[in-house]
Amino acid sequence: MKSTDRILAHKYSIALSSLADKKDLPSLLAELKEIHLAIGNSSFFYSPAVPKKEKKQALSSALKTDNFLIKNTLFLLIDNKKLNLLGQIIIDLNKTIESFTNTVSAEVYCAREMDDKQQNAVIESLKKYFKANFINADFKQDKTLISGLKIKTADYVIDGSTKNNLQKLKQVLQD
């Protein structure tokens, strides 16, 4: 995606978040995700050969929502031929919601599967580290790490894996 499209998607997400009540943002995001999944890669909605009016009619009949803000946003995207930005708008809106709720999303990679107690301990540690109210952690297994954890957030990568430590040691010994 071009940087100008990312900037434009960010502007749409800012407009959405400023027009909606903060408490309604999570449900708004969920509805947009559902709509994005429903229209997916449909050539109908993205084809320049299909008139805007037909796209709007099809979207209106397919939408389960009565949310005025969602309908108008989608119609505006269709009018401006920017429906392809919906995925990025959802990503940006999710980041906005996370900042409002002081939530951090993290991918946690570990060499072996962790039980619930271990996962909760990692989540509590991340809450303290990031001074966050909530942590959305996605735990994944990566056997190449040997042991330890590797944590990725939007802004940070924390690598406490044995694999990383061995690579650092190798680098030091080679220098």
From Swiss-Prot:
Listed A to Z, the keywords are: ATP synthesis, Cell membrane, CF(1), Hydrogen ion transport, Ion transport, Membrane, Transport
Pfam families from the UniProt entry: OSCP
Instruction: Provide one Gene Ontology cellular component.
Output: proton-transporting ATP synthase complex
Membrane topology type: Peripheral membrane protein
Provide the protein's localization.
Cell membrane
Q: Where is the signal peptide?
A: none
Gene Ontology MF term list: proton-transporting ATP synthase activity, rotational mechanism
**UniProt xrefs under SUPFAM superfamilies:** N-terminal domain of the delta subunit of the F1F0-ATP synthase
Domain of life here?
Answer: Bacteria
- Family as reported in the entry's similarity comment: Belongs to the ATPase delta chain family.
SUBUNIT field: F-type ATPases have 2 components, F(1) - the catalytic core - and F(0) - the membrane proton channel. F(1) has five subunits: alpha(3), beta(3), gamma(1), delta(1), epsilon(1). F(0) has three main subunits: a(1), b(2) and c(10-14). The alpha and beta chains form an alternating ring which encloses part of the gamma chain. F(1) is attached to F(0) by a central stalk formed by the gamma and epsilon chains, while a peripheral stalk is formed by the delta and b chains.
Q: What does this protein do?
A: F(1)F(0) ATP synthase produces ATP from ADP in the presence of a proton or sodium gradient. F-type ATPases consist of two structural domains, F(1) containing the extramembraneous catalytic core and F(0) containing the membrane proton channel, linked together by a central stalk and a peripheral stalk. During catalysis, ATP synthesis in the catalytic domain of F(1) is coupled via a rotary mechanism of the central stalk subunits to proton translocation.
Write down what this protein is called: ATP synthase subunit delta
- The protein's organism comes out as Elusimicrobium minutum (strain Pei191)
This chain is encoded by the gene named atpH
